Amino acid sequence: MHRAGLVRLVRMGLVYLLVAAAAALGWLWHALPGEICLEPGQTLQLPRFAWVEPLRGRGSRNVASTRAVGSYQVTLALGGWLPVRTIRAVVTERPTVTVCGTPFGVKMFSEGALVVGFSDVNTAAGPENPAKAAGLRLGDRVIRIGSTATEDNDAVKQALEAAQGSAVEVVYVRSGEQRQTSLTPVWDASSAQWRAGMWVRDSSAGVGTMTFVDRQLGVFAGLGHPISDSDTGESVALRSGEIVPCEITGCSAGTAGSPGELKGHFLSAHAIGTIRINGENGVYGTTRTHFSGQLREIAFAQEVVTGPAEIWATIEGETPRAYRIQIERVSDADPRRNMILRVTDPALLAKTGGIVQGMSGSPILQNGRLVGAVTHVLVNDPTRGYGIFAQTMLEQAQQAAKTDHAA
């Protein structure tokens, strides 16, 4: 009986070990990147997964040094023996860009009119709100009313006037999905016009930080996150946009629960670049303007590690300065939040309290290479924030160049 119980315990222990091992391998499979970049002659190493290497017996560990530029399948294994995941290794020349850290102004016009508020219309029958009655919500983007394409606020007004109180079809976009509804404008005697009871916005403006410029392609990358509407938080759907010169004139320091902000103003209405993409990973566009900065290599995503680094930020005037930070965490799981950063530089902490709005796009450098850009501040701890890989931003910038050629 005693022996049978012992055997049962051993079996249960083995089952638990197998389950734990399977869970660990599953976690590792998801944690490993599905694709990595290497330059010719570079050994395939994953500093964040030191115990993982290419499966032995199936090609050289130095994948790049024995092969030409191209794409290859590589099986990664624990200790080189236990296969975990097959990934794609892209062998390419290491890119070099002009790292900036300078402020720029943004002027954008949206694709459609964004609903940013509602207000009842006083009619002879009492307060009414046709927009709400039609089911419209904050953040909806109205792209057509009747036969009128609503590219701006004036077009919305003209379409409502043309309806003359009759029901009209409204085409709008919500969460990326195009929808239709029917709306009946009402007469506002106080303003002598037909109204829908909604406030709309067709443009946006602000200040951000330029991460880098690729002079060879004639493209720029900045912010590290999309330009969003200040009232709804919705990303602005780009119809057209440009960047202009800007200088920082002041700063409100951040505190726990209250993010700070850089204050600036446009120096000129003359555009120095055209925005082509307002995406989840930043603002990208084309430019023929010479931007000041330093030529630096871009670190591939797997080369970014925890430890000391620096950001280039402009908190006064137009000239950036380097400030010390610590990269506390690196992950491939969320393409918009690859790093968690902590400001350690006393000078920056004294002036801004850490990371503030307007610093988004500030370049992050480690071991002399551009590894990423600041994207967001942690609201409850302004000394800490998020960052995105520079490799991701470069891929988006290259897409902006293709968009320009297609146009």
Kindly give the residue locations of the regions a language model identified.
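Interdomain regulatory linker/hinge segments that flank or connect interaction modules
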Residues: H2-R3, R56-V99, R276-Y323
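Hydrophobic membrane-insertion alpha-helices, especially the h-region
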Residues: R8-L28
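Short, flexible surface segments
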Residues: L38-W51, L138-G139, V305, S360, ...
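PDZ domains, with a preference for the canonical peptide-binding region formed by the helix
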Residues: V63-R67, R144-E177, D381-T383, I388-Q391
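PDZ-domain C-terminal substructure recognizer with occasional recognition of PDZ-binding tails
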Residues: L76-G80, R85-R94, K157-G197, A406
